[in-house]
Each structure stands twice: as structure tokens, then as C-alpha cells.
Amino acid sequence: MAHRRIILLLAAAAVAATSAVAAASSGFDDSNPIRSVTDHAASALESTVIAALGRTRDALRFARFAVRHGKRYGDAAEVQRRFRIFSESLELVRSTNRRGLPYRLGINRFADMSWEEFQASRLGAAQNCSATLAGNHRMRDAAALPETKDWREDGIVSPVKDQGHCGSCWTFSTTGSLEAAYTQATGKPVSLSEQQLVDCATAYNNFGCSGGLPSQAFEYIKYNGGLDTEEAYPYTGVNGICHYKPENVGVKVLDSVNITLGAEDELKNAVGLVRPVSVAFQVINGFRMYKSGVYTSDHCGTSPMDVNHAVLAVGYGVENGVPYWLIKNSWGADWGDNGYFKMEMGKNMCGIATCASYPIVA
């Protein structure tokens, strides 16, 4: 009897280990679909989900996801719709991670959003970044270019922020670049107002929550006389009335520098020897589930009219033989690799060097 019990325990352990490996390959721990939620919250949501979907492992997995990310669904029809999207996202994660690519996907809070919803709430409309057609970055001594760079180690990169349900990525790329430049120049941290750019920079071919470009934002700040601090002009994530106040300015821009369209050698020179650079690229569906590794794709475009998301290049390096850009995103610190991702370098991947610029601060 004791011998049989040991065999059963070993078998159970093997099953558990297999489940854990499968969960790891999907980027989503489903070994116990309801384990990490509170009893009260789990019970309430489980009842809602079971009523709409039936008592299945997948339904409980979905309930756990919803509780973890604070989801609220209006009725049974919405539960069913979100569950269907979630299931498609889970399959995308698993199938991608089985391909042996240099990056991995994982389930995150975007897993129950359709691609159309995600585009509308997180990405901007394509912009014709004509400023980079003829760049004005002066190449610095290539002999001084470090093999790897991470400006976070220099203490000038500000914390990751979250743009919320507003296509204002361009404002966060802009403030991230300015915050780094200001701290580099003064030794002092600063948090700058994205909302001022959303509300006030429309005359410079920017469109608030519908998109814009850092190069155009730098021009606005230069001629406006400055950008207010975050404290004085806090973020709301919706288009509003401009209420910029000169007395609350946190930084002024003397000029901006543009990287020649597609010139990754210029971009590397700037990131390695100057400071973090605002960049933009084309987000395609799978990218929103990025978890770790060096992202690469054969399906994204590289032209100015392809790019739809602005971010901040804060370094570069090599991982498992693949050169990469280290990039700060604006989807919160719980997204990706603590709010960051790596993008393959050397192919102008997804247009990463197509619309790149950085400011010179006063």
C-alpha cells in the first residue's frame, strides 16, 4: 500500500511539473486557475462567469485573469465576448512561444481587448514625420561608442508611466526624452506634463489622444516657451482645454535634433553618446502581449506612414547573439519587462529608426 501511495504521489508531482512547464510556455500560470484571488472576489466573479460560460477550467482561468486585472463586465453577452477574445489571445501566446523565437509573449491586461479596441485606445494615427527626411544629428567619435548602453544605469531615465486609454504615446515619448535631458543637465529629477501636450500642441500637427510626433512636440515646446511640470498640469488621459501657465514651466527646449530616416548608425551614435532618443515604430497585434526577449517580426512596416506608436530608446546591447534596442514604453510598469522591451537592431525593425529625434534643453 505504501509503495502504491509513493507511486501515486510521484505521478501527481509529474503531472504538476508538466502543467507548470505548459503554463510557462504560455506566459500564463494556469496550474490553479483561481488560486491567487481572494475568496470573496473569486466567488462573485466565478458565479458571473459560470452563469455565462459554464463551470470549466478555461472559465475559471478567465475569472482569475479578470480579477487580477480589475476587469468589470456588464452582462453575460459581454462576458462571453471577452472570454472569446481572451481565449484567442491565449492561443496566440502559446503558438508564438512554441516557435523558438528570440522573444516570448505572455498574457497581460490587454488579453480581453480586440485588436481594433487596442488600436483605438493605445495607438496613434500614422504621421508623416518629414522632419527626419534630412537629419541633423552630428555623428560623434565612433571610437568612443560603448558596446552596450543602458541610460538607466546613469540615473537619468524617469519611471515608466501609463498613457491609459488615450493615443497619447507621443507625449510620453516626448516627456521621457525631456526628463532624461533635464536630469542629465542638472542632476535633478523632474516629471513633465503630458496633458499639456495633449491639450495645447494641436497647432503643430498633433492630435491629442489621436496621435502626434515627438519632433512636432519639441517644436511646440520651443516656441511656446516651455512645458509645465506634471504636478502643475496633471494627466487626465482625455482631450481638454489648454491651460498652460508659464510660471509652472519645468523645462524649456532650445532646439531638437532629428535622426535621418532609417539611419540606425546615427540612432546608435545618439543613444550611445548623447542620451535617450524618442523613436516610433509600427505595433502589430502580437506585440501587445510582449513579455521578454528581443522582439522581431517579418510583418511590420518601416515607412513613416506605418509607424503608430512613439516610445523612448534608452540603450542597446546583445542578447543570445541578437543585437537589440532597449526601449521604454508607456503602458505601465506591469507590461512587458517592467515596462520596457527589446527590439532587434540592424534592420530598422518595424521602423524604429524612421521617426527618431531628441531635444536640446535650456
Curated annotation (Swiss-Prot):
Recorded GO MF terms: cysteine-type endopeptidase activity
The record places propeptide residues at 25-144
Q: Which residues are glycosylated?
A: 128, 258
The protein's UniProt keywords, in alphabetical order, are: Disulfide bond, Glycoprotein, Hydrolase, Protease, Signal, Thiol protease, Zymogen
**What upregulates it?**
By gibberellic acid (GA).
Q: Which Pfam families match?
A: Inhibitor_I29 (PF08246), Peptidase_C1 (PF00112)
Q: Among its keywords, does the record have Disulfide bond?
A: yes
SMART domains, A to Z: Inhibitor_I29, Pept_C1
Name the EC number(s): 3.4.22.-
Q: Where are the transmembrane segments?
A: none
Task: Determine the domain of life of the protein's source.
Answer: Eukaryota
GO CC, one annotated term: extracellular space
Q: Which tissue types show expression of this protein?
A: Expressed only in seeds.
One biological process GO term for this chain?
A: immune response
Q: Is the keyword Signal assigned to this protein?
A: yes
Family assignment?
Belongs to the peptidase C1 family.
Against PANTHER family, the record matches this protein to:
CYSTEINE PROTEASE FAMILY C1-RELATED
Q: What is this protein called?
A: Oryzain gamma chain
